[in-house]
Structure formats: C-alpha cells, structure tokens
C-alpha cells in the first residue's frame, strides 16, 4: 500500500502487484494463499486485426511500424497500443503513447485514428502535437496484427494554429455522392488545435480546424484556411469534435467538454442538397454559428446525464446514440466512478441527432486514465468500441494507449460490452497480492481515489488527483484515526508492508504516527507484533518498510494518527 501524504492530511499513491520488471507498490504479503488470476482467456475480451499496408500515400512525415500480438494470449491482443513494442524492438514503437481513438470503416479496412502523447513520465499535463492511425482489415481480427502509421498529420499544418494542443480528432470519408466509386472520395479530419489569435487575445485558444486529403493517411492540408469554430464563438472550450452524416444527408458536428455538449448542423448545397464538410449553419445574420445545446430528457441539463466530454453520435435503425466520457460524481444516477478525475463510457439515446437524450447506462467501466474518449462503429458484421487507458508500461494520465473491444446489442437496442479496461495479469508469481484486495477508507477527498493505492502503479510524480488517496478536509487538521483497509475474499499470510508518504506545498503532510493492524478470527482489529519500526520518511525514493510477525488474516489496516 503506497501513501502520498501531506500537510494536515494523508494521501496515498498507486500501489499493487509486484511482477515482471516493474515495481508496483502495495502491501508486501507472504507468498502463501495468493489470490487467483482475475483475467483468463475465458472471461477476457479478444479483438484485434490483420496487417494492412497497401494504401497509396505520399506523406514524408509518416513512420510505419508493424504490430504483431498474435503470439500473446487472446485477452492481451485488444489493447492495440498498450502492447505495442512487445514483439517489435523499435524504440519509437516501445515509447509511443496514443490516445483519443476514433474509428473509421472504409473500403474493407478499419482505421483507428489517435492523438500522440509525448509527455514525460513526470510531466503533469498533455503534450500533443501530431496524430497517427492504426490500420487493419477484417481477415485477421483475432490475430492481433496492425500497421501503425505515425505522424500522419501535425497541428502546425494549420498556419493559424500554434502547433500545440493536437487533441482528439475524427476522420470522415466523403464519397461525393458516388459510394460505388472510391476514386473521387475525399477525407476530412476535424481536430482541436490552439488558435494563435485567440491565444494572443488572452482567450481560451482552442478551436476546431478541418483538414482535407485524398487518403486517410494524408498528406493533409487545411481545407478552409481558418478555424471552423472558435471558443469565442461557442463560449465553451471547443474540443472533441465528432462528425456525423444522417441518412437524409444532413451533417452534424458535436463537440464540448466540462459537462456541456453543443452541436451544429453543416450547410447544404442549394442545388444538390449535399451536406458541406467545411461550412457550418449560421443564424439569420449569416455569421453567427447556429449552435444547439444538447439537453437531457430528464433534467434539461447542458448535455446527456453524466456527460463530461468526448461525445460520439451515430444512428442505428431509427435510434440515435450518444456515447461519451461520463460518470463524474454529482451527476446523479449516471455516476459510475469514485473520483471526479475519472471517467467511464456511458451512452444516451434519442429520436433526433439533436436530442433530448435519454440516459441508458454504462458501456465500459472506469479505467486507469482520467478520460477514455470512446468511438463506436460497425466493422464487418460486428460492432466495436475504442477507448484509451493509462495501463501501458510507463503510462500515466498523460501517456496513454488505445484499446478496442466488441459491442453487443440486445433485442431492444441496448448496448453492452465485455470490455473492462484492466491490465493483463502478469504471468510470473508474486509475493505481493495487494492488487487483489478491496480497498476501503474512513474518508476520501472527492477528487482522490482510494483504488489508486493498489492499482498496480507507482508514479515518480503525482500529477493529478486520481493517482493518489488523500484524506484532506476543509476543516482544522490534523485528523485523528483515519485508516485504509485491504480486504480479501480469502485468507492471506502477511509479514511486511511498504508505505510511501509524500508532502506538498499546501496542506498535505505525513501522519504523526501509523501502524499496521490485522483482523483477527474473532472479528477484532489487533496490532501486528514485533514491528521493525514505523518511520515517516517522505518521497518516492524513501519507502517506509515495516516487517512483523507473520499473521493469517482476511484484512489489514493502515491506521494513522496526527
């Protein structure tokens, strides 16, 4: 159990299973009575693809890597980017982190477009300047083979953009009204980037740009020479564009974040009636974007219930589906996470692409990153959901990897998925079974997450709240008697614990004292005997390790005072 502690309160950082070459913090437990592996070939999802490397392209920035996960167990093949580098020694491949996946099915190929996380392990923000794409086809879905085209486009392709903030985008194909003839097709890439003029004016710089290409691999060029939409026009941070063309030919662009989802129709050609991919509908003045605010069917909020960001809208039959990052605490029945710095994938439905939206439920539970950013599409005769996690080796909330899993449908049109974004189990045995325990705490600050103490990650720098547990309160400190408990379904035999404490410049500090207790067979908590000592050293380089007489128990408690 690793703790990140602070002035007048205690916070704990990621902990868990020690295995392979990665040190994952947690309660150090004796090797007896280990919990069974939770991921097996029978209960874990299996999705992958066959390498496709035949598209014509002429893009000098592109680097191509072949990914072959076919030798891995089936349940480890679906994290496309998470396992990249396992079978390919290329350093660029091993160190490549991808996020914000959006999928496109075109000409028998599956394209998963992503952003590129370049943040260092201790950097507490996004560093994103370009986009890439994973490509496969239907023939080898279970082989785990992909072709990764890196840097198919850069944010600085827009002369009006700063070259930074290459966040989540989407590529759509325009068949120019001739679906049987692909020779005249164009591709449009809707991406959020930072606008130079807005930034110079001290405004939120994010804007949506649209690029154009004859190939989904590029090269891409600015389609209109200016932002399609800016934050000053929309009055919300203008990110996460999602483009959708309805069966009647009307195009819609959805976007938004921080609980507000907006949409705008695209203009139609007066002669042909075809939707424009580069012009939005305006109000009667001819210049003001005609924005539509998405409403929840129950409470008339500024978005579907639980909505945070990353909308993805599509139609199936007569029903419109709105899939998004959601589940923030405070969103009522849509809450599916413990921390407001986490997300799950939820969805709502409507009989209109502009809502109102009726909440339906969760497709994919919360993962290891602060966002998940879904896309959903049909490829062949199956449906899939893409998303990202922070589970790749060396991953953080700003160094992510994309995944893909199957989506199933009930007879009444409800979406379900077997996806559960967790790390694949390590194959080597371990003396540490912290990750198999259920965690409880006497108090957890809202932005923090008690599950971080045994999620299998130890970060050298704690950059956002989900990476630690804290008992900070806005009342006079110190608090006495706060504790964290590991509870197992069966008995374990424990003889040591390793704890990390940390401080910050505000109100967090190490506890005045702490001790380890175990749950006795009679149901009472008892102190472990012969402890080697309870130090309160702070910092990741100085874990506090205590050994004690071995105990057989179903629960261990870290009890803190002061």
Model-derived regions, located:
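Aromatic, loop-rich ligand-recognition surfaces of beta-strand-rich domains
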Residues: 464-530, 540-562
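Short beta-strand segments within Ig-like beta-sandwich modules, predominantly Fibronectin type-III
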Residues: 535-537
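Beta-rich carbohydrate-recognition and catalytic domains
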Residues: 42-168, 173-236, 245-303, 315-321, ...
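Short, surface-exposed loop/turn motifs at beta-strand boundaries within globular domains
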Residues: 96-98, 105, 126, 306, ...
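Conserved positions at the start
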Residues: 98-100, 166-168, 238-240, 308-311, ...
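Secretory targeting and sorting signals
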Residues: 1-37
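Juxtadomain low-complexity/linker regions and immediately adjacent membrane-anchoring helices
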Residues: 412-468, 503-515, 559-562
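Catalytic nucleophile loop of clan PA
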Residues: 243, 375-377
